[in-house]
Each structure stands twice: as C-alpha cells, then as structure tokens.
Amino acid sequence: MSQQEFDVLVIGAGISGAALFYELARYTNIKNIALIEKYNTAATLNSKGTSNSQTIHCGDIETNYTLEKARKVKRTADMIVKYGLMQNAQNNFMFSHQKMALAVGDIECDYMKKRYEEFKELYPYIKFFDKAKIKQIEPKVVLGEDCNQDRPENICAMGVESGEVFTTVDFGKMSINLIEQAQKQNKNTFVAFNQEIIHIEKKDDIFILKTSNHQEYHAKSVVVNAGAHSLYLAHKMNLGMDKSCWPVAGSFYLTKQKLLNGKVYMVQNPKLPFAALHGDPDLLADMNTRFGPTALVIPKLERYHGLKSVPEFFEALKLDKTVLKVTFNMFKDATIRNYIFYNYLFELPFVDKSLFVKDAKKIVPSLKASDIYYAKGFGGVRPQVIDKTKGELMLGEASITETPGIIFNMTPSPGATSCLGNAERDAKLVCNYLGMEFNEDKFSSELL
C-alpha cells in the first residue's frame, strides 16, 4: 500500500482527532492510519490552551449536568487522567488545582446543599464548603466590594482542594503528545500538516479526498473531527442535511494579577445552553485569573483566520424556514434573548469591561474594571448544532453516520474532556466497518 492510501484517514489534528489517531494506533489491529491537518501544527483552533478553559469537565462542579449525564461524563473524564498518568504528564500538561461550584444567595445555597447530597456518592472526594472554608481557600471570593469586610450574602460551595484530583489540562500540549505516542505503536502512521481537505467522494468502497494544494488521498474509512467544519464537509457530500449550525464564539478577560487559587464556577441557568461565567487560573498567563467565557454567535466557522470561513459558515448553516423557526423560538425566551444581546455588548470597546465586571463580581466582589483586560486572541468557536427534524438545538456532541465508512463529528464543549471516550466509540465503529479488532482488554486496563 502506498503512502497515499490508508485503511483509516482522520481529518483534524485537534484533541478529538489526535485522540482517535492514538486509539486506532494503540488499541486496534489496523495497520495504515493517516492524520491530516490543514494548519502547520496540531491543535491550533479550539484545542489550543487559549481557546478553552483548560478544564477537565468531570461533572462534579458543572451544575448544568444531571446525575445521569455526570456519570457518563465522569467515565470519559477519568480517561484523560489515566492517560496523563501513563505519560507522566503531571505538571506538564495535567495539573491539580482547587475547584468549586459557588452558590450565592439563599436560593442557590439551598440548591447547592441538595446537589451536594445527590452527587457526593459519585464523587466521594467532593466536600461542602461553608463561607468560612471558602474564605480559607479562596479569600477573594469572600472579601466584600469595599475590601474591608466579608461580602454580605449567604454563600456556600461544593468542591475539592488542591492536590486531591486533577482538574486542569493544556489540551493543546496533550494533542501533540497523543500524536507522538500514536507514531510509536509500530503501525504505518502518517501525519500531514498544511493539507486542507476540500473535497470528499466515495467511489465503490474507497473514499477519495482532495486538498486545496492538489494532493489526493485514498482511504477505506474516514473520520472527520474538524469542529464546525465537519458539518460543512458533510453538506458538501450532501450528507447531514437534517442538521444546521450556529457557530458560538467565546471570549475571555484576564486579570493583571492572580486573584483566584483555583477554578470557581457559578450555578448554571438551566434555560441557557451556554456555560455560566467562571474564573480559572490560566496555565499560559502566569496563573493570573481568566474570567469567561462570553457567548456570541458569529458568521464564520473560525474566529481568527480572516474571512475565509464566512462562505463556509453559510454552507454549514443552510438557512431555511426550520432554522429561522428554531432561532426565533430561542429569541422569544426573554432570558436567552437578553443573554445573547448582553454578550454582544461585552465585545464593544469602552463599555465591555464595566459591563463584564458586573457579572464577574458575583465571583470576586472587589473586582474593578481596571483589574481586567480583554484577552485578545483567546477563545474558540463551538458549533451549536440544530436538529432540523426535531426543530431544536442539539445539546452535546453530534455525529453524522448515514454513509457507511465515514463519520462526521461536531463536538461543542466539553468536547476536549470527552475526546478519549468519543475516540473509543469511533474506533469501534471503524473496526466494525473494516472487519478489524478493537483490543477491549488493553483499552480497559489502561484507560478505564
């Protein structure tokens, strides 16, 4: 078999593509595996450390997760930690910090007490923090607006102190590590950068893939892990036409000094499909605090690569009556409508910081506009997929598998945390299609 012909070809070298590339190489008997990336290195978009909150979302402090969802997420999140320990990644790309879900006011505190009782069996390490304990581990959260006395509201939290569990990952570094480890598995593993796939077609049982610089690859099976571009490429093949996508960008603000010792999340508004504001020590900014994300719909699939992805956005959107109806129904809800408009204001010069600080003060009451600055170049784009058949937003990952042998994945947050679990699912699908084997025993002993 020549270098340009493969059993499996994975498109996209972010954390999802890298995880699948690794699992195919390590846990299957597939011999010829390719990873194709359009930029000059791995993880330049959503998996880059500046594009996400660097959090292992295991469900303990994510208040938008039900107990049932938390069980599923925990399984895949634990794989991240197991892999990191296999690679001795402690303090390299995997770190342990304090983290908590913060409740402010009597209503939220009552909710948090109930949530703690419900979740403590699944997360035995989790502890309930009263105001005094929070003051001990996160003093800025308790300090009042005047910096002289404690904030007046009733507050509590559920969380874990530093050193007990791993909480933080540089998913960009982890992507590179996964690719390096895949190339050590005695397989024909081929990695190509600066190769943008622009055309895919299936002839007989072979997929033919063409790039923008006139390269051609052939593969028996293809998995597209290209973020919002996965839907764009599917639509070009006339697949996934029952799905549309609004790209949602997230921005962050950085502090000029370290304000928080660990991750502080707020109670999620159940009406909103977006993450609640949180504060995190940033691995790439001297552990200064990063607040965010905001959420704004933008008319392009990539945020920081000019206007090239604007026409690609319209191809992925496929605007029609159903998309308009779903969007209109969202805007009919005052909570969602106000949230979306408010987040656009966070992007406007002169008013952005003062407005943002009002929200962030719920975490650090003494925070002032002069303490923060807009984190230019930070934040990624998450595809919020619309199911046209059901006429609603799809929360969580979406896959298109209608043509045998090719999978298109769109992974909004927490896609990085679920990368190894999603890779397990796709590796098994690929093996089943090709008549190959997935080594369950080896996988379970190493990652479960």
From Swiss-Prot:
Give the catalysed reaction(s), semicolon-separated: (S)-malate + a quinone = a quinol + oxaloacetate
Give this protein's Gene Ontology molecular function annotations.
2-hydroxyglutarate dehydrogenase activity; L-malate dehydrogenase (quinone) activity
Top-rank taxon of the source lineage equals Bacteria
Known pathway = Carbohydrate metabolism; tricarboxylic acid cycle; oxaloacetate from (S)-malate (quinone route): step 1/1
Presence of keyword Flavoprotein: yes
**Enzyme Commission number(s) of this protein:** 1.1.5.4
Q: Which GO terms describe its biological process?
A: tricarboxylic acid cycle
Query: What's the cofactor?
Result: FAD
Regarding protein family, the annotation reads: Belongs to the MQO family.
**What is the protein's known function?**
Catalyzes oxidation of malate to oxaloacetate in the citric acid cycle. Donates electrons to quinones of the electron transfer chain.
Its protein name is Probable malate:quinone oxidoreductase
Please name the gene that encodes this protein. mqo
